Amino acid sequence: MEIRERDGLARIARFDTPHGTIETPTVLPVINPNIMDITPEEMKKYGVHGVITNSYIILRNDRLREEAEKYGVHSLIGYDGPVMTDSGTFQSYVYGSVEFNNRQVVEFQKTIGSDILTILDIFTTPSSSRQEVENAITETYRRMLEVNDAGGMIAGPIQGGIYPDLRKRSAELMNSTNASYLPIGGVVPLLESYEYDKLVDIILNSKLNVSFGKPIHLFGGGHPMFFAFAVYLGVDLFDSASYVKYAKDDRLIYPDGTRDLARIIEIPEWSPLFDKYTVKELKELPKEQRSVELSRHNLKAIFMEISEIRERIYEESMDQYLAQKAKSHPSLLKAYVKVMQYSKMLEKYQDLFKKAAYFFYDSFSTKNTYVARLEKFTSKYLTSKKKETYVFSRKDWLPGYTNLNFVRDVYERTECNALIPWSGIMVPAELENTYPIEQTVSSGLEPDPDVSAISESISPFDIRVYKGESVDSDKIRSFDLEKIRTIADYQFGYGIGKDFFKDDVRIFKSKTGRIRGVFDKGNKLIATLRNDGFFTLTFHGATLLYNVSKSPNLRVFVKNESAEYNAKGYSVFFKFILDADPDIIAKNETLVVNENGELVAVGKATVSGKELREYSDGIAVKIHEGRDQSAK
């Protein structure tokens, strides 16, 4: 997988097949080689990058098998793009068995030129017992090993039923094989019964236990209603027969659900049927023709949602989109609550900042990944200092509107902490300009922060509600200096700030009072303090950070052949990475180190630390200053 854009676990990526590149997220429409009312060639205009067809159907039909063996599956279905073939697993589940074994099915898929082959795995359902699921995992793993040397791109399905630990085990087993494409199987019954909250558990326990370099496919997840949730959790591909199945039942797919033809009075403007029929004319069409036309509508709805999701990833607004989608159906809201329960786990994959503003909608927004990150930092901020803490109401200190009276009369004359309200929690006042604290667009429905919650970190006797008082003593510290130190603690690791910004650094501010530059003995430490409130380091600043931080913190270790170019300002590519700090946050400043342990450049990580070690294609770190550039 080559990653192009990302927003947390959601990504726009691409991978190559013998018949072309597939760009994700996307849907592979299911093609029945016996009945192709909409040809794969026609599907291209809807945004189709690849299709999936069933090798078992082809194998058991003499005419189809002979044609596929002679001319290939691409010729059989009339499509020159990437073709994935399924193995007959679902048919085995429905009918009890199939007449071909795993090796025969895989060899046949190779023979007919499939781009992505699928093993004959063991299907399990949500009602399968734990023992049945364990047996299925073991047998599926054995079958994968049986064809491990088959060559090409092989799909190794992840099973595990509704048991998160078994999903994890299956994912780890499949990841250890030559399977380079990982579908999540056994989920269709959950999708059909709208049990989306269980799918959240299944997807995350699969996704987070395999390599980020492998595509993740949600087998059977063909309705757009759940696409955004699945992509948010790391799914790259879906397959869909629903566009045809629903059409045969006179049902129209919309991005937020399904509607019966008998109950609609308008054809939406985005539908390919809008200028072609009235609703009355559509209802009066012969059944077979009507099904074909409704299939076109359904296909358009599916890919319209995929297009919107891709745009949201590019905008880095998937959090907002998920919050909006959650209110479209009670089952999605239940799934959203489940996603929020994973916020602490997902936080490490969340960017340091985003292009899009942070939207606060309601109480659910208090469970966001950024809230989890800031709560964790605030706890460290309080427990490490353990001193008098002033708390503010929204009317006394809003992010970006510093309470200068407090700074002058109290903060700079004491060693106190200061906490301001944001999204229903209290955060350090020194972080007021950092993302997402200042970059929040709020509904105004934030709950008042529970001040008693911070009593877990400090004594309740040390908490003060600011009421305009003043301390009668001399100035003993600078708010600006403490601000940049706290930002450094948040951005680079707690405790770094004081070592990085010594007492004698010079701070330069804009006419509006914003900190814009920091110098150490005439050397610029930060190239800029951006609108997101975080630091972009110069190479001199990176050198100081390298000296005051412990390896492997914030470091990416690269081959010397790459380091030579990185020192000149060229980006780091994934394929040259030897190792990386697993705790690196996407978009944070990253120290590029050669095989000798020498700092050669500083740049911005494009992905998280775990991802840095697992992708093989694309840009890993965008360099903004190399050692050789600094020396000029």
Curated annotation (Swiss-Prot):
Q: Where does the record locate the signal sequence feature?
A: none
Task: Give GO terms: molecular function aspect only.
Answer: pentosyltransferase activity; RNA binding; zinc ion binding
Q: Which SUPFAM superfamilies does UniProt cross-reference here?
A: Pre-PUA domain (SSF88802), PUA domain-like (SSF88697), tRNA-guanine transglycosylase (SSF51713)
Q: Which residues cross the membrane?
A: none
Give the reaction(s) catalysed.
guanosine(15) in tRNA + 7-cyano-7-deazaguanine = 7-cyano-7-carbaguanosine(15) in tRNA + guanine
Question: HAMAP family recorded for this chain?
Answer: TgtA_arch
By sequence similarity, the record places it as follows: Belongs to the archaeosine tRNA-ribosyltransferase family.
Query: Protein name, please?
Result: tRNA-guanine(15) transglycosylase
| Organism, as annotated | Thermoplasma volcanium (strain ATCC 51530 / DSM 4299 / JCM 9571 / NBRC 15438 / GSS1)
